Swiss-Prot record:
UV-B specific signaling component that acts as a UV-B photoreceptor and plays a key role in establishing UV-protective responses in plants. Upon UV-B irradiation, UVR8 undergoes an immediate switch from homodimer to monomer, accumulates in the nucleus, interacts with the photomorphogenic repressor COP1 and regulates the expression of the transcription factor HY5 by associating with chromatin (through histone H2B binding) in the HY5 promoter region. Changing residue 233 to A: Reduces response to UV-B. GO terms for cellular component: chromatin; cytosol; nucleus; plastid. It comes from Arabidopsis thaliana. Keywords: Acetylation, Chromophore, Cytoplasm, Nucleus, Photoreceptor protein, Receptor, Repeat, Sensory transduction. Changing residue 145 to S: In uvr8-15; loss of function and interaction with COP1. Residues 397-423 are annotated as: Required for interaction with COP1. It is found in: Nucleus; Cytoplasm, Cytosol. Changing residue 300 to A: No effect on function, homodimerization and interaction with COP1. The modification N-acetylalanine is found at residue 2. Changing residue 337 to A: Reduces response to UV-B. Pfam families: RCC1, WD40_RLD. The lineage of its organism: Eukaryota, Viridiplantae, Streptophyta, Embryophyta, Tracheophyta. This is Ultraviolet-B receptor UVR8. GO terms for molecular function: chromatin binding; guanyl-nucleotide exchange factor activity; identical protein binding; photoreceptor activity; protein homodimerization activity.
Length: 440
């Protein structure tokens, strides 16, 4: 569909980068002036530009111009945005299992509002691999998408093609939610921590390896109240109101940061950062990032593609500080599956890790094991902010595409064919039970 796109360039005064978010192999950013940019892998429509092309540099998502977007969030291969003024939640990308919330499982190559959420005031949105959640201003939670392990919190294992309210939170005001591959976590306004969904590695923090179909409160926090939570692929990170960091779940690659490879079934305080006040956290597929109140960024876990950002490709079992030019302080971080994004106080955006599909936004498809400035989004870039613009021709761009048109279902080692996780290239070792669908 590249021939249907008229590409030019937008040069404007520097705009503040408000939000960054990293998916499996794509990235998005929200800039002041109501500009949404996306880049990286586009095969499933997750970039929203009306085609299936990869983009190695940030490209303005013209379909959302004028919609006054206030948040953007990446799932693995889909994206969700919220317009506060219009009270609309938009979604696009890979649609299998209903993760787009439109009542079907088709892929969508341009943003479309979710009818079931029209008119609802949204406070926060979280996207996992194949499911999504939205927290309303009233503290209620809506969930939709894949639910084979109960990650929607609805009390069953049926996928939901449209958002449904989590009834288990009736009378409980939720502050925020986080979504992993097949599990979910939440923090209440009162600082209580909850987990539900797939719990095989202790990633629910409930002291066992059992799935939960409805949210269950985590009681083993030593009396600490939590202010935030984030989910990696199969691990979970939380921060208390005192700024202490806790991790639990899968630790095969050191992603819990405790200096070993042991899983933890309950929240375990990360002593290596006990002298720091943690202000933000993010979980990748097998790596973790934590930002301190004084602008220092620490990373640990799986580092095959340099996604930890410390200048090598060795796994890190304990936190290591990520260094930036001129010791710039970091104000925001987001982990993708195998890449990481960060924004500094000077309004510069950096990326590192896997770059095969252009998800680093640096204009080329190469890996980086240390922070590389995204010149198109950064004030300190060689030419300042210089964002490409794609103008979609609505008469010729893609809209709905059924997954059956582009994928074949293959059996796993048990002979079953009802699995989920789609591979993103042959460069990774994915458990056989995770690979059930392949492109044709």
């Amino acid at each position: 569909m590249a021939e249907d796109m008229a590409a030019d360039e937008v040069t404007a005064p520097p705009r503040k980068v408000l939000i960054i978010s990293a998916g499996a192999s794509h990235s998005v950013a929200l800039l002041s002036g109501d500009i949404v940019c996306s880049w990286g892998r586009g095969e499933d429509g997750q970039l929203g530009h009306g085609d299936a092309e990869d983009r190695p540099s940030p490209t303005q998502l013209s379909a959302l111009d004028g919609h006054q977007i206030v948040s953007v969030t990446c799932g693995a291969d889909h994206t969700v945005a919220y317009s506060q003024s219009g009270m609309e939640v938009y979604s696009w990308g890979w649609g299998d299992f209903g993760r787009l919330g439109h009542g079907n499982s088709s892929d969508l190559f341009t943003p479309l509002p979710i009818k079931a959420l029209h008119g609802i005031r949204i406070k926060q949105i979280a996207c996992g691999d194949s499911h999504c959640l939205a927290v309303t201003m009233e503290g209620e939670v809506q969930s939709w998408g894949r639910n084979q392990n109960g990650q929607l919190g609805l009390g069953d294992t049926e996928d939901s093609l449209v958002p449904q309210k989590i009834q288990a939170f009736e009378g409980i005001r939720i502050k925020m939610v986080a979504a992993g591959a097949e599990h979910t976590a939440a923090v209440t306004e009162d600082g209580d921590l909850y987990g539900w969904g797939w719990g095989r590695y202790g990633n629910l923090g409930l002291g066992d390896r059992t799935d939960r179909l409805v949210p269950e409160r985590v009681t083993s926090t030593g009396g600490e109240k939590m202010s935030m939570v984030a989910c990696g692929w199969r691990h979970t990170i939380s921060v208390s109101y005192s700024g202490a960091l806790y991790t639990y779940g899968w630790s095969k690659y050191g992603q819990l940061g405790h200096g070993d490879l042991e899983d933890h079934l309950i929240p375990h305080k990360l002593e290596a950062l006990s002298n720091s006040f943690i202000s933000q956290i993010s979980g990748g597929w097998r790596h973790t990032m934590a930002l301190t109140s004084d602008g220092k960024l620490y990373g640990w876990g799986w580092n095959k593609f340099g996604q930890v950002g410390v200048g090598n490709n060795l796994d890190q079992c304990s936190p290591v500080q990520v260094r930036f030019p001129d010791d710039q302080k970091v104000v925001q971080v987001s982990c993708g599956w195998r890449h990481t994004l960060a924004v500094t106080e000077r309004n510069n955006v950096f990326a590192w890790g896997r770059g095969t599909n252009g998800q680093l936004g640096i204009g080329e498809s190469v890996d980086r094991n240390f922070p590389k400035i995204i010149e198109a989004l950064s004030v300190d870039g060689a030419s300042g902010q210089h964002i490409e613009s794609s103008n979609i021709d609505p008469s010729s761009g893609k809209s709905w595409v059924s997954p059956a048109e582009r994928y074949a279902v293959v059996p796993d080692e048990t002979g079953l064919t009802d699995g989920s996780s789609k591979g993103n290239g042959g460069d990774i070792s994915v458990p056989q039970t995770d690979v059930k669908r392949v492109r044709i």
